[in-house]
Amino acid sequence: IPCRKAIDVPFGXRYVVXTW
């Protein structure tokens, strides 16, 4: 299971990263 970190960015939406 890849890790996911949800980051709320000021330029719209939500950015999900973390695929380590």
Curated annotation (Swiss-Prot):
Protein name as catalogued: 23 kDa cell wall protein
Organism lineage string: Eukaryota, Viridiplantae, Streptophyta, Embryophyta, Tracheophyta
Principal location listed in the UniProt entry: secreted
GO cellular component: extracellular region
Localization terms from the record: Secreted, Cell wall
Domain of life according to the entry: Eukaryota
Keywords of the record: Cell wall, Secreted
